[in-house]
UniProtKB/Swiss-Prot annotation:
Could be a structural protein required for the infection process of B.lactucae. The lineage of its organism: Eukaryota, Sar, Stramenopiles, Oomycota, Peronosporales. This is HAM34 protein. One of its GO terms (biological process) is sporulation resulting in formation of a cellular spore. Transmembrane segments: none annotated. Germinating spores. Residues 22-155 are annotated as: Disordered. The gene is HAM34. Residues 22-89, 134-155 have a biased composition (Low complexity). Residues 95-133 have a biased composition (Polar residues). Keywords: Sporulation.
Length: 173
């Protein structure tokens, strides 16, 4: 009876090794494995998404000597058209409103050339490759066969070790 137990355990170990060698450990992504991502140096700036719990957020920043307030009861306001004079600070007051959809509403004098609305941008707010610099493909994208070979060897080693332990255990039972 012990001899038959050893044969059954050996057959299970052989079946486990064969099944693991036949199927790859991970399925390679054929689209990225055959065509690595192209390098890019495009700089894209996106606005952050509004908090899900708030309907709108308003932020006001004040700069310049007017921030402390006038002492004689009068207030002077520099032009808010984006121009700068020698005596007036840059846009003493700038207000930006952020709605729940993530769109930014700039005021006059605010540079909006690099703002992108989250509602029109596809994907996450900072997609891969949109950062400054050169993007490189992941190691798993360009060479998945090396990962599969290593993982397959690891599974084979583990199956042999498991079969050995089971065989020795069955012998002493």
């Amino acid at each position: 009876m012990k001899f038959s137990q050893i044969l059954v355990l050996a057959a299970i170990a052989v079946a486990a090794i064969s099944a693991q060698d036949a199927a790859p450990a991970t399925t390679p992504d054929t689209a990225t494995a055959t065509t690595p991502a192209a390098a890019t140096t495009t700089t894209t700036t996106t606005t952050p998404a509004a908090d899900a719990g708030t309907a709108s957020t308003e932020q006001t920043t004040t700069a310049g000597p007017e921030a402390a307030g006038a002492t004689n009861g009068t207030t002077t306001t520099p032009p808010a058209d984006g121009t700068q004079t020698a005596t007036a600070p840059l846009d003493a007051t700038a207000t930006e409103e952020s709605s729940a959809s993530g769109e930014m509403t700039p005021t006059v004098g605010t540079d909006t050339s690099d703002q992108v609305s989250d509602s029109t941008a596809a994907g996450p707010s900072t997609p891969e490759g949109s950062m400054t610099g050169t993007s490189t493909p992941k190691a798993s994208d360009s060479s998945s066969s090396a990962t599969d070979t290593t993982s397959g060897a690891s599974h084979t080693t583990m199956a042999v070790a498991c079969a050995t332990v089971m065989t020795v255990g069955a012998y002493f039972l």
